Amino acid sequence: MEPFVTMGLVLKETRYREADRILTILTPKLGVITAMAANSLRLKSKLFSACGLFCYSEFTLVPGRNMYTVREAEVQNIFHGVSSSIEGVSLAMYLTELAAALSPTGEEAARELRLVLNSLYMISEHRTDLRVIKAVFELRTMSECGFMPQIVCCRDCSTYDEGDAFYLDAQEGHLLCASCAAKAGKSCNLDKAALFALRHICLVEDKKIFAFKISVGSLAKLSAVAENYALTHLDKPLKSYAFLKSVLP
């Protein structure tokens, strides 16, 4: 079959044999794909840098029976700043594993790819709290993949933002005001600022998802809810999660 060119982000690399790598790549038109990068672990290989973890590269791929083969690869962005801290690396590993688990296979994933790239850029720039980046990615990814919570108003009384506390049900994805949460025997897990941020993350256009401010206290609530919501809807645990929590509790 004829080779073709695509942009792609390396979400995972697995050593195979002496110097080969099997790559999990997120692409804009084919979603998540698997590709063999032969001899890419050799320092003199032209594929060495472009096939590394978190590398955004231009790949020339040859279709195969079970996976693609990387014929050529040229680096576009390596996100150098990600590796400058253990917290940044652990978060990047978590986000890319989450993206690999939730992004489609064999169909368009341009928005998912853009979100991962933007998140890695934010990590590498060291200007935004890592907990904000994590919460934004979790909530936006779930929303993009069809798991957006029903956050416009209280499920039971339809109030929009009356009161100072709210409850988001991670399993069912619905919102309750403080009064309705009490009637249902639930303890509120969001304050008004955290709810505002949650709505912002899920509903605004892509280029504005990080454009909000939040206090430390409200961020703690948002972070807990975002993480619980994302992990509740995954089919299996993420291997990177325990490591992330050990360095970024």
Question: Language-model features: where?
Answer:
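Non-catalytic alpha-helical scaffolds and adjoining flexible linkers that form interface surfaces
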Residues: 1-249
